[in-house]
Amino acid sequence: MPAPEPTPDLPIAETLACPVPPEQRPLEQYRELQQSWFFTWPHASFKGLAVPLVRSWLIVLPLTMLVATGSVPLRHNLPRLVVAGAVAGLVVPLLMLLRQWLGWTNLQKRLMATAVDYEESGWYDGQVWEKPLAWREQDLLVATHEVKPVLERLQQAMAITAALMLVGTSLCQAL
């Protein structure tokens, strides 16, 4: 009986050149999100996320107040008008948080995956390439230590925004 051939320590994918275009690799996507002016807000700290959200709320607040004045019952009740306009203004920051959360969640899924989906020339030729072990380890480290804290900050911010909306809506009903 012949002896079995020794199996190499490295998977075949590690010995082959990477067919995934550089711009479609998960780590490159991480670098792009990290350098983007919009997606970098939650990356550094919670304050780095809160300041632009408050600014966006303050920018949209006059518009929501103007729209709220279109309601006859609110026009005659100033405190209720202010609260309704403020609550309506929270929709924009909440949508911004949702967009950021979707982008970072997609990145985390790609980093945690054992294979990379990519397209060489267009939408019709989707390919899958198994990540080498070294890539998987590096991607897992980035997903765990860089992306996970960002997602936690975004979830906290969304919870705070939703709570503010609920409190504001309750206050508006109480007035």
Give short role names for the model-derived ranges.
Residues 1-9:
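Long, low-complexity intrinsically disordered regions enriched in Ser/Thr, Asp/Glu, Pro/Gly
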Residues 17-71:
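Cytosolic-side membrane-entry/anchor segment at the start of a transmembrane helix
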Residues 81-110:
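Hydrophobic alpha-helical membrane-embedded segments
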Residues 40-41, 70-77, 109-114:
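Membrane-interface interhelical loops and short amphipathic "cap" helices
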